[in-house]
């Protein structure tokens, strides 16, 4: 037995992956052509995504996300990704989802989650892998936008959406600004997580723990 095969046989869990971020350049190009979305400047000469720092990465992420326009697009994305990691031995995944990015493409929260849930179900039927979703607000969109995501998740519960979090540019907004959103999510029974310590120091981690009452840091 080769080491590669042996590694694939070990059961694994993927606990931190942003669903739009798993899209391959080929898929993004295909959907951009299909939906007539301008993605100029998104790719480097050799075909990969073009970014050199975290701010450019976030901009590239936003651009690539715009090509997903229908629930079927998201079902395809979720199914393709989950099937791929199942081949590597994954039996469980938690997908970070961004209702703000879906809304920017004209999708309602219900259609967005419904499309992803369909893809999850298809992947599970094919491979046995299970998945759940963590809905995140984007901190550089502002506290009001993050609260809107928390409100959507709380008032439109879905059995596969089990968590709420905070993502985006860590330099935009102190965690205290988002405490209300996290209280709303906690009252709805959701698990809480936040990105902290990526581009800021240890004080960002401390603030996330103090003001957001998270049980996990990403």
Where are the language model's segments positioned?
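Metal-cofactor-binding active-site regions of metalloenzymes
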Residues: 1-190, 199-204, 209-211, 215-216
């Amino acid at each position: 037995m080769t080491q590669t095969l042996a590694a694939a046989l070990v059961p694994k869990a993927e606990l931190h992956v942003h669903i739009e971020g798993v899209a391959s350049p080929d898929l993004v190009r295909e959907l951009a052509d299909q939906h007539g979305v301008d993605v100029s400047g998104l790719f480097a000469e050799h075909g990969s995504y073009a970014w050199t720092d975290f701010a450019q990465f976030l901009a590239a992420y936003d651009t690539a996300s715009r090509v997903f326009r229908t629930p079927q697009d998201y079902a395809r994305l979720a199914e393709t990704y989950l099937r791929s990691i199942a081949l590597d031995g994954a039996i469980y995944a938690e997908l970070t989802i961004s209702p703000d990015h879906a809304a920017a493409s004209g999708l309602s929260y219900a259609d967005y989650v419904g499309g992803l849930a369909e893809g999850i179900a298809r992947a599970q039927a094919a491979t046995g892998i299970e998945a759940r979703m963590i809905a995140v607000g984007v901190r550089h969109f502002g506290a009001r936008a993050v609260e809107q995501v928390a409100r959507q998740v709380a008032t439109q519960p879905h059995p596969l959406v089990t968590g709420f979090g905070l993502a985006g540019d860590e330099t935009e907004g102190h965690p205290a600004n988002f405490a209300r959103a996290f209280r709303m999510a906690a009252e709805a029974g959701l698990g809480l997580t936040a990105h902290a310590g990526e581009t800021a120091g240890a004080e960002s981690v401390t603030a996330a723990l103090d003001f957001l009452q998270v049980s996990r840091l990403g």
